[in-house]
Structures are given as C-alpha cells and as structure tokens.
From Swiss-Prot:
Gene3D superfamilies the UniProt entry points to: 2.30.30.30, Nucleic acid-binding proteins, Ribosomal protein L2, domain 3
Residue stretches spanning the membrane: none
Protein name, entry field: Large ribosomal subunit protein uL2
Compositionally biased tracts (Basic residues): 36-46, 264-284
Name of the coding gene: rplB
Entry's family note: Belongs to the universal ribosomal protein uL2 family.
Highest taxon of the lineage: Bacteria
PROSITE patterns named in the record: RIBOSOMAL_L2
Pfam families: Ribosomal_L2, Ribosomal_L2_C
Length: 284
C-alpha cells in the first residue's frame, strides 16, 4: 500500500510514499499507543560508512552519489541454514539499505536473525528451514523439495552460497520444471534459467510490492537518500562529454556514456562465459 499527499507544498504535490502499514510499531512491542518505528537490533546492525561513490584511490567510480543520512547496515541471513529449528517473527522492520522490508526472527534456542520479509508475513507468524518444512510463506528449503508452480525468492546460484537472485521488493520466481538434478526457474525478467536442485529458496514473494509506484516529489528527498543531481551530456562542453558542445542544440550523434560507450542496444554479457544454464533469453 502507498499514500498520496494533499499538495499543500510544492514538495508534496507529486509525493507518493509507502504507507508502512505492514511494519511493526514500537507500541505493538510495548503494549502502548506509540506509532514509532522499531529500532534495529543492536547486535545485528552496525554503522555503514558512505563511500560517496569513490573507490580506494579516491576517484569517482559511481557518479551522482554523495551525502545523505547516516545508515546502519542490518546483517541479513541470506543462507537460511538453521535447519529444523522453528522461529517466530518478532517484528517486520524498514531497512534503508534495500527496497524490501526485513523480518526479525526469534528462534526457539534463543538466536535472533534478520531475513527478507516475504509478502503477507506478520508479527507472530512461525517459519522454519530445512527439508520437510511446510510449503508456506517464509519457509526455506532446497528447490528439489518445492512443488512446481510455487513462487519463490532469495534463490541461491550455487548450493550453500546464500541467496543471490530475486531479492528486490515485490519480486518472485516461479518453478517451471525439474530434470536430471536441475530445476528450471522463470525469473522476474522473463528469462528461464536452470539451477542446481540443491540450491535453496524461500517460499513466497518479496514484500513491499508497491515500491516501484513511489515518487520522491522533490530533489531534497533524493539528497536524503544520498543521490546527487545528474547533468545532461548536451549541457556540457566537448571536453566533458561526447554529447557536449555545438552551436545551439545538436542531435546528430549516437547516445553514449561520458567515456564513449554506446548506451542503447549494446550487449554487456561476457561472450566468453557459458550461457548453457539460460534456457530461454528474456528478449525472445
């Protein structure tokens, strides 16, 4: 869900933000009427120093980054390898480092871990990992154990490496087929890809599906996120960009990056690497 605002100021005229109705409030934990958001678990978070888009030499390696509010990184359990131990969802929380929400799990043996919050999960739900787990939202198991047609997320590319695929808000992959130790998944991009059947995945879709509908509404909100302004190449001088210069506006060039690489239609996948695991390309 998301909410729109009355245009009482220029910054709220186009503003669309998540409603955060799925998140647990401090009042729910304390039994009060407080609507404050839950603070992250101290043992599972640490201060994340911003790079400002610079590499180890101090050079700008990623443009349009810098500033923004201080962030604490939440340590997420992407491996979900605590098998056979049931966990209770203590809270569903906001994470500034990703588009999806996260859920804090309290295991029966006392351990606590953060996971990506699946769609529909709420405080008090119970989840479990490992073979023989029920096929319900939030449970994690190997791909060979999950029936065909089930939607999954946080999928491993190699057994034991931790979830790498399908982790952004609102995404899910669908299990299409199982053959000779491999499982075919339909990815969110439309690509059909084969993975080892021993790779793990979590049942359900990722939370915060309306993330793509949100509008920042003003430049200042982008700066809070650490995003700096973008200058068009045509507004630059020839020394700064291939599109720069010219008397007036000139449009007789192929769209390029500041370093002369073609931006539209250029294939970026390494030709030397095997694509035998891709059953069907997303473009076909």
């Amino acid at each position: 869900m998301f909410k729109k605002f009355k245009p009482v100021t220029p910054g709220t005229r186009q503003l669309i933000l998540p409603s955060f109705d799925e998140l647990t409030t401090q009042g729910e934990l304390e039994g009060s009427s407080s609507k404050r958001s839950v603070r992250p678990n101290k043992k599972l978070s640490f201060f994340k120093k911003s790079s400002g888009g610079r590499d180890n030499l101090g050079h700008i390696s990623c443009r349009h980054r810098g500033g923004g509010v201080r962030r604490h990184y939440r340590v997420i359990d992407f491996k979900r390898n605590k098998d056979g131990v049931e966990a209770k969802v203590a809270s569903v929380e906001y994470d500034p480092n990703r588009s999806a929400y996260i859920a804090l799990l309290n295991y029966v043996d006392g351990e606590k871990r953060y996971i990506l919050a699946p769609k529909g999960i709420k405080r008090g739900d119970r989840v479990i990992s490992g073979e023989g787990s029920p096929f319900k939202t939030g449970c994690c198991m190997t791909l060979k154990s999950i029936p065909l047609g089930i939607s999954v997320h946080n999928v491993e590319m190699r057994p034991g490496s931790g979830g790498k695929l399908v982790r952004s808000a609102g995404l899910s992959a669908q299990i299409i087929a199982k053959t000779d130790g491999y499982v075919t998944l339909k990815m969110p991009s439309g690509e059909f890809r084969m993975l080892n059947e021993m790779c793990r995945a979590t049942v359900g879709e990722v939370s915060n599906a309306d993330h793509n509908l949100c509008v920042d509404g003003k430049a200042g909100r982008r700066r809070w996120k650490g995003i700096r302004p973008t200058v068009r190449g045509t507004a630059m001088n020839p020394v700064d960009h291939p599109h720069g210069g010219g008397e007036g506006r000139h449009n007789g060039y192929i769209s390029q990056t500041p370093w002369g690489k073609v931006t539209k239609g250029l294939k970026t996948r390494d030709k030397r690497k095997s694509n035998k695991w891709i059953v069907k390309d997303r473009r076909k």
